[in-house]
Amino acid sequence: MKLVQEEYRKGPWTEQEDILLVNFVHLFGDRRWDFVAKVSGLNRTGKSCRLRWVNYLHPGLKRGKMTPQEERLVLELHAKWGNRWSKIARKLPGRTDNEIKNYWRTHMRKKAQEKKRPMSPTSSSSNCCSSSMTTTTSQDTGGSNGKMNQECEDGYYSMDDIWREIDQSGANVIKPVKDNYYSEQSCYLNFPPLASPTWESSLESIWNMDADESKMSSFAIDQFPLSFEHGSGRL
């Protein structure tokens, strides 16, 4: 002869089941759950009746969100006792162990999400702008330095370069520039002298003839003064 195993109801509780359980708990108390489940005709296990009463139907339960004081107490007790939810629940009247456990898991989930949360768009855009400005500045600096280096390699000396080298190494630094300058002048000054033109020699001969005539005239006056005076007296 086979014993037919009784099947118990599972799943969500209905409103009629909640009312029936409350009535029988008031009659027989909240200790003998197997007996309450059997005499009530709920077709539920004693464990299921107890959990339904403790977590949802007990008149002393608090409804709604936990207060900041309760949340702080949960965190402190969990740090002290760990996951002993029933023990923690006894320190929070009106709160069940299941409710406290759910709060703890929600709290840890939010904390993990905050750590993984990306940066805000404003801070991200400011960082992008600052990085682009840094890149542009480095490129500009590199371009100017490259140009300066190229000019130095080509032998070009600007005034800034000369004064900078004077400050660093003294006045001898500009010696190469000075040598180059005199070498350039020597290119223009070392030509052979040009021959004098023909008209310059003609002018010199004319001036020489005039000088000779003036000398002869003065000589004649000195030698024959009376003749000139006599002749002038006649006239």
Curated annotation (Swiss-Prot):
Highest rank taxon of the organism: Eukaryota
Record-annotated HTH myb-type domain positions: 5-57, 58-112
CDD domains documented for this protein: SANT
DNA-binding residue intervals: 33-57, 85-108
Annotated stretches, region: Disordered: 109-147
Tissue specificity comment: Mainly expressed in leaves and seedlings, and to a lower extent, in roots, stems and inflorescences. Isoform MYB59-1 and isoform MYB59-2 are present in roots, leaves, and seedlings, while the expression of isoform MYB59-3 and isoform MYB59-4 is confined to seedlings.
Motif, Bipartite nuclear localization signal 2: chain positions: 109-117
PANTHER family linked to this entry: MYB TRANSCRIPTION FACTOR-RELATED-RELATED (PTHR45675), TRANSCRIPTION FACTOR MYB59 (PTHR45675:SF93)
UniProt-recorded name of the protein: Transcription factor MYB59
This protein's encoding gene: MYB59
